[in-house]
C-alpha cells in the first residue's frame, strides 16, 4: 500500500484525531473491521464490501500519518522517544493488517477466483460470518442496536447492514434496524441459532456432506481455515501480551507466526504438486492469496509484540487504548462456587451468553491457548477473552462465587 495520500487531506489536521491515544484506538478498530469485511467480501462474493475495504485503507493511511506526526511532536527526551517508538510500531502493525485486508479485497475486485469449497468452508472457522435478513415479524424491527445488545445476547457482532442498495458499515448503538435489513454478523458458531430466531427466520438446514470423500482440495481448504483461525488468535494474543506485559504470551505469538510460515509453505508446495490436476487452475491463485492474507496478519501480530522482546516500555496509555476500543481484552479469575467453576466452555456457552471469545486460560503457571469446547474451567483459572464491554460484565458475573 502506498504511504502517500492527498496532501490537502494530510495537512488538514483538524479532521484528524487530536492525540496519539485516539489515533491508535481508531487504527485498531478500523484494521479489525477491515479484516472482518474482507472475509465477508470473500464469503458473499461482494464487490461492494470489497470496495469499502479499499476505502478504509485510505483512512488508515491518514491515521498512520497522524500517528507519525504525533509521535515526533510528543517526544522531547530519549526515554519518551523510546516509548513513542513502541507505540508507533504498534500503529504500523495495525496498518500492516489493513494492508493485508486491502490486498484480499482487491482479489475480489479483480475477479480472481476463490474455490466455492473455500467459501463453503469459511463458516467452519472458529469465528463465523453469516448473512441474515430481518423478517417483518422480527422483534428487531425498529429496534436500536444498543437496545437489543445482540453481541451480549447471541454472541454475534453486526459488522455491516445492507438496506436496499445501500450499506451501513460498522453500525453503532444508535443504528435503528428495519424490516428487510440484511445483517452481516460475526461471532461463535453457537450464536447463529439465537440470531436467526431474533431475526424471525428459521435456521436453514445445511447439507453436512456426510459420506463424501475428502480430496486434496478439501485438505488445502481446511488448512487455510486453520490459517485464518491462527491469524485471528495471534492478533488477539498480541494485544493481550502488550496489555498485561506478558513475555509468555508474546512468545506464543512468535511461535504462532512460525507455525503460520510452515502452513503457508505446505500450501504452496501442494499447489505446485496439484497444478496440473485441478481445473480451472485459476482457482488455485485464490488459495494462494488467502494464505498470504492470513500469513500477513500473523506477521503483523508478531511485529506488534516485538516491542516486548526488545524490552521497550509500553506507556500506561496503551491500556486505555485497549479498554476504549470497540473490542476489548479482559482478564477474569474463576472463583470457587461460581457458575463457571467445573463447567466446560461448551456447557457454559460463553460465546452465546456473553459474546466473549476465549483466547486463553491460565492455570497455575501453565497456559492453554485457543482452548477447545471441551476445556473445563476450575477455581483459580484466569480467562483471557475478547469482546464488548457489556459482554465482559456478564462474564465477570458468571465467574463470581454464587451467593
Short names for language-model regions:
Residues 1-403:
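Cytosolic, long alpha-helical scaffolding segments
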Amino acid at each position: 500500500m502506498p504511504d502517500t495520500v492527498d496532501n490537502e487531506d494530510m495537512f488538514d489536521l483538524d479532521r484528524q484525531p487530536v492525540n496519539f491515544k485516539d489515533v491508535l484506538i481508531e487504527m485498531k478498530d478500523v484494521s479489525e473491521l477491515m479484516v472482518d469485511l474482507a472475509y465477508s467480501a470473500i464469503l458473499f462474493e461482494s464487490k461492494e464490501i470489497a470496495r469499502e475495504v479499499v476505502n478504509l485503507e485510505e483512512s488508515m493511511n491518514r491515521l498512520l500519518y497522524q500517528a507519525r506526526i504525533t509521535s515526533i511532536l510528543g517526544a522531547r527526551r530519549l526515554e519518551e522517544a523510546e516509548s513513542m517508538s513502541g507505540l508507533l510500531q504498534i500503529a504500523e502493525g495495525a496498518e500492516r493488517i489493513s494492508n493485508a485486508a486491502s490486498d484480499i479485497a482487491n482479489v475480489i475486485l479483480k475477479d480472481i477466483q476463490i474455490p466455492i469449497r473455500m467459501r463453503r468452508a469459511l463458516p467452519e472457522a472458529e469465528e463465523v460470518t453469516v448473512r441474515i435478513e430481518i423478517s417483518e415479524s422480527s422483534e428487531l424491527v425498529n429496534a436500536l442496536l444498543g437496545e437489543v445488545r445482540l453481541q451480549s445476547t447471541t454472541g454475534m457482532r453486526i459488522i455491516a447492514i445492507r438496506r436496499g442498495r445501500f450499506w451501513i458499515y460498522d453500525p453503532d448503538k444508535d443504528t435503528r434496524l428495519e424490516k428487510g435489513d440484511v445483517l452481516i454478523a460475526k461471532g461463535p458458531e453457537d450464536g447463529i441459532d439465537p440470531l436467526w430466531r431474533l431475526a424471525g427466520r428459521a435456521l436453514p438446514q445445511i447439507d453436512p456432506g456426510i459420506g463424501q470423500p475428502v480430496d486434496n482440495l478439501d485438505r488445502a481448504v481446511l488448512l487455510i481455515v486453520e490459517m485464518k483461525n491462527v491469524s485471528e488468535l495471534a492478533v488477539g494474543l498480541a494485544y493481550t501480551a502488550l496489555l498485561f506485559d506478558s513475555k509468555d504470551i508474546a512468545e506464543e505469538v512468535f511461535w504462532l507466526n512460525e507455525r503460520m510460515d510452515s502452513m503457508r509453505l505446505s500450501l504452496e508446495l501442494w499447489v505446485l504438486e496439484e497444478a496440473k490436476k485441478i481445473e480451472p487452475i485459476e482457482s488455485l491463485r485464490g488459495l494462494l492469496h488467502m494464505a498470504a492474507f492470513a500469513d500477513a496478519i500473523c506477521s503483523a501480530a508478531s511485529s506488534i509484540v516485538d516491542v516486548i522482546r526488545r524490552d521497550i516500555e509500553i506507556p500506561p496509555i496503551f491500556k486505555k487504548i485497549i479498554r476504549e476500543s470497540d473490542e476489548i481484552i479482559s482478564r477474569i479469575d474463576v472463583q470457587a462456587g461460581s457458575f463457571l467453576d467445573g463447567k466446560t466452555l461448551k456447557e457454559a456457552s460463553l460465546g452465546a451468553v456473553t459474546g466473549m471469545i476465549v483466547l486463553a486460560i491460565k492455570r497455575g503457571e501453565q497456559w492453554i491457548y485457543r482452548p477447545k469446547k471441551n476445556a473445563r474451567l476450575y477455581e483459580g483459572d484466569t480467562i483471557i477473552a475478547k469482546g464488548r464491554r457489556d459482554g465482559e460484565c456478564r462474564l465477570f458475573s458468571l465467574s463470581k462465587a454464587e451467593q
